[in-house]
């Protein structure tokens, strides 16, 4: 979440040579996230990774959590998209980020629900208990639409973005009695741990990364983590003349 600010601050307040050091650090973080959390079997990114492989929610072999939580992946691809805005056109590693964004969005589109155009809360689980979730769907729609406009993604991704946006309108937007609207079915929060440690007052073993855990977290309307990306996606639709 912090990388877009990090990149913009570096570019806007530092001389190019010094700023490049921080841009390289940002790209390293994106690349290492891919390396540490990507799952070849599902072609998705796990919610988290534990360096020690000792956290109670982590796989003891590779340190990864159990599942791909959609909003975690949403944050990841939004960060890449926003960081690219800050990176100068001649920055040596810019294409590296574009390539990684394409890798991620190819998988995102693969997991887009064909019927509704939106995405489930836990992407790698097929279950009647899983639910279509609006914050991640708004994030993905925004990245698909903006990524095409900026030239990072090809036209097929624009089509997926428009389908996603229309799906959001149909699945999640509720018109209230006072004629305002609400974005419904927002996952309030999901996280992992913390486990026991010197600075942990009370471990939270409920947050174990299981599918059952994700389904236990509350769902609410108008969570800012969804409203913001939905507004951004709406602006992209308007800017590109896609709203009928």
Predicted regions and their residues:
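CBM-like carbohydrate-recognition segments
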Residues: 126, 132, 141, 149-244
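Short clusters of hydrophobic/aromatic residues that line enzyme substrate/ligand-binding pockets
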Residues: 45, 119, 183
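Solvent-exposed loop and edge beta-strand segments that line ligand/cofactor-binding
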Residues: 57-78, 89, 93, 112, ...
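Long, well-ordered core segments of solenoidal/helical folds
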Residues: 23-57, 98-116, 160-178
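Active-site lining segments of carbohydrate-active enzymes
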Residues: 4-21, 25-40, 44-64, 81-89, ...
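Structural helix-adjacent loops and short alpha-helical linkers that scaffold large soluble proteins
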Residues: 9-27, 42, 84-103, 109, ...
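Short, solvent-exposed secondary-structure junction/capping segments
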Residues: 2, 116-117
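Well-ordered alpha-helical segments within folded domains of soluble proteins
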Residues: 1-11, 68-85, 133-149, 223-238
């Amino acid at each position: 979440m912090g990388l877009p600010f990090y990149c913009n601050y570096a570019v806007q307040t530092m001389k190019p040579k010094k700023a490049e050091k921080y841009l390289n650090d940002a790209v390293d973080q994106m690349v290492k996230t891919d390396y540490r959390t990507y799952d070849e079997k599902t072609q998705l990114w796990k919610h988290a990774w534990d360096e020690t492989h000792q956290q109670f929610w982590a796989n003891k072999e590779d340190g990864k959590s159990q599942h791909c939580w959609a909003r975690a992946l949403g944050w990841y691809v939004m960060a890449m998209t926003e960081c690219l805005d800050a990176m100068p056109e001649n920055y040596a590693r810019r294409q590296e980020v574009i390539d990684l964004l394409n890798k991620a969005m190819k998988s995102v589109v693969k997991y887009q629900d064909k019927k509704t155009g939106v995405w489930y809360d836990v992407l790698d689980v097929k279950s009647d208990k899983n639910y279509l979730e609006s914050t991640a769907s708004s994030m993905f729609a925004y990245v698909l639409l903006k990524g095409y406009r900026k030239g990072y993604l090809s036209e097929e991704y624009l089509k997926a973005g428009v389908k996603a946006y229309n799906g959001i309108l149909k699945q999640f937007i509720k018109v209230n009695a006072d004629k305002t609207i609400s974005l419904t079915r927002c996952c309030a929060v999901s996280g992992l741990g913390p486990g026991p440690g010197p600075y942990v007052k009370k471990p939270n073993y409920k947050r174990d990364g299981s599918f059952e855990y994700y389904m236990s977290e509350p769902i609410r309307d108008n969570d800012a983590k969804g409203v913001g990306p939905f507004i951004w996606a709406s602006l992209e639709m308007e800017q590109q003349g896609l709203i009928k």
